[in-house]
UniProtKB/Swiss-Prot annotation:
It comes from Pseudomonas fluorescens (strain Pf0-1). The keyword Heme applies. This is Cytochrome c-type biogenesis protein CcmE 2. GO terms for biological process: cytochrome complex assembly. One of its GO terms (cellular component) is plasma membrane. Heme chaperone required for the biogenesis of c-type cytochromes. Transiently binds heme delivered by CcmC and transfers the heme to apo-cytochromes in a process facilitated by CcmF and CcmH. It comes from the Bacteria. It is found in: Cell inner membrane. Belongs to the CcmE/CycJ family. One of its GO terms (molecular function) is metal ion binding. The gene is ccmE2. Residues 1-8 are cytoplasmic.
Amino acid sequence: MNPLRKKRLVIILAILVGVGAAVGLALSALQQNINLFYTPTQIANGEAPKDTRIRAGGMVEKGSLVRSGDSLDAKFNVTDFNKTVTITYRGILPDLFREGQGIVALGKLNADDVVVADEVLAKHDEKYMPPEVAKALKDSGQSAPAPGKEG
């Protein structure tokens, strides 16, 4: 092999190794940032991974919200009208958070099948429903409750 050909081969191999490393790092970063959505039924059936960041969503069950008197801790149940999952959250709940409305919680599922959320997203108006929640409710054979007037 002449020196010119050898030099080209080394350059091509170096480029391939560099591209491979870049793709590997990108895939690794994306895999760590992907938060899959799970319904309360999927969580109750054991389909959601434990100790991995997930998104859980559904309708907040009426009468299930319990706030701590001396801290920002909140505990509530979310349902897809088939099964229910408990969510705990430490922080200020969004202004639009209400019982009977759709939410998506981001957090980790613990060993007791309780989602320990570090972020709670509430719908932003009476007509909006997070797409994942709307699909989960449709799949369960239910529809979202009609928006009522609150005053």
